[in-house]
Amino acid sequence: MQLCVALDLEKKEDNLSLLQELKGLDLWAKVGLRSFIRDGAVFLDEIRKIDENFKIFLDLKLYDIPYTMANAALECAKLDIDMLTVHLSSAKSALTALMQRLNALKKRPLIMGVSALTSFSEEEFLMVYNAPLKTQAIKLSAMGKESGIDGVVCSVFESLAIKEALGKDFLTLTPGIRLDQNDKEDQERVANAKEAKQNLSDFIVVGRPIYQAKEPREVVLELLKDC
């Protein structure tokens, strides 16, 4: 299991300062919409300057028509990133077009499809998708696998079921990781790192428990022990 550190702080300088504290550790730097829109592609180069071994996870959750998604993913791949997220709800035609475009490259990032955001409650998911969350997450994940993507973004609570249905080689990335399960904030389906490993998660995403800590490096070291 590998650790992705979410870089969601208010200022670019704060994100870079956090990474300076984590220099030398085996982790992924997760760049989401806020940081990428604000700081641009140059931010990725600044991450590499701190530690060239940091792997870069661009969490943009692409969702559009097939032509637009394929072109956007290609431009993201040109940034030499290691992982990119897309929405499974964009459907098989879009995912297939995207993978055909990326597979023509000598090197491409891992493509992870978002099944159900961890902010969804069961009731909210049912309202949007008119299906039980776990059932639909597996169905969307199966479509993603058929399209050729590498894995899915899901909660810890769907990870094991997806692995059992689609095979252990199909990757799962699980956000909503907390040190204390009572600390939900804006997430609904949260778990800790040990539970993520028990449910065969390949990647975990941790943000606030790290960057809100007095000693972020110590928190990361503890998390890495559980990985």
Curated annotation (Swiss-Prot):
The keyword Transferase does not apply. Pathway: Pyrimidine metabolism; UMP biosynthesis via de novo pathway; UMP from orotate: step 2/2. It is an enzyme of class 4 (lyase). The keyword Metal-binding does not apply. It holds the Pfam family OMPdecase. PANTHER family: OROTIDINE 5'-PHOSPHATE DECARBOXYLASE. This is Orotidine 5'-phosphate decarboxylase. It comes from Helicobacter pylori (strain ATCC 700392 / 26695). The gene is pyrF.
